[in-house]
């Protein structure tokens, strides 16, 4: 949790946005929107697919659009998910359930988890607009009924699915990690699986 960072000697500056970047042989200077200028030996860009540091470092990152959207929501299942990830591969794309701790108290709130449902853009919009009961029925059917009924616990949202690879991960004293370096399809959580080696390389 980010709240533990100060105890590890990490200084937090938030909320803040990066506005300027300058670097030379001795170090890098990052200017924030509140006027503060941070100086360091390296700037690690871990600021996501729309990385401001990547843009300021003039590193190109071409985008390939899958013309799909990832529909996400917080849900409760009627049947226990047994603290296991569930995934089904459908003609329209995979649907996955990522479990939260299953304490078995289904009478209180059901068995909680979050879904990521990969869909063509028009189908995703249809399900975003569908009445809640209809969406829940279609979601249950997408999982083959194995988890029983589904009950929405949040609003539905969707994000575009794209592949984006930075042309290089290092520019002088700026290093890209995680989604700032590579954005990929959420299938099987490969985004985080590729981000962790970036962090390991920093420690080497």
Language-model features: locations:
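A structural signal for short hydrophobic beta-strand segments in well-ordered beta-sheet cores
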Residues: 20-21, 97-99, 169
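Conserved FAD-binding catalytic core of PHBH/FMO-like flavoproteins
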Residues: 29, 43-157
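FAD/FMN-dependent oxidoreductases across multiple families
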Residues: 125-204
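Short, flexible hinge/linker loops that cap or flank conserved catalytic cores
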Residues: 37, 65, 109, 168-169
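A secondary-structure boundary/capping signal
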Residues: 14, 118-119, 180
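Structural motif
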Residues: 6, 24, 91, 109, ...
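Conserved N-terminal helical subregion
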Residues: 1-56, 62-69
């Amino acid at each position: 949790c980010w709240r533990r960072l100060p105890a590890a000697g990490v200084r937090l500056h938030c909320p803040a946005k990066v506005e300027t970047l300058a670097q030379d042989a001795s170090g890098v200077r990052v200017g924030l929107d509140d006027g503060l200028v941070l100086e360091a030996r390296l700037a690690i860009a871990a600021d996501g697919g729309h990385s401001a540091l990547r843009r300021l470092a003039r590193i190109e990152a071409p985008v390939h659009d899958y013309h799909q959207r990832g529909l996400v929501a917080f849900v409760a299942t009627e049947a226990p998910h047994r603290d296991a990830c569930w995934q089904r591969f459908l003609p329209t794309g995979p649907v996955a359930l990522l479990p939260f701790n299953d304490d078995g108290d289904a009478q209180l709130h059901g068995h909680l988890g979050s879904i990521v449902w990969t869909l063509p853009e028009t189908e995703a919009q249809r399900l975003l607009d569908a009445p809640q009961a209809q969406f829940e029925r279609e979601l249950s059917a997408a999982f083959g009924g194995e988890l029983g009924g589904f009950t929405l616990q949040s609003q539905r949202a969707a994000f575009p699915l794209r592949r984006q690879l930075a042309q290089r991960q290092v520019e002088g004293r700026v290093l890209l990690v995680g989604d700032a370096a590579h954005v990929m399809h959420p299938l099987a959580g490969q985004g985080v699986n590729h981000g962790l080696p970036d962090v390991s390389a920093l420690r080497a």
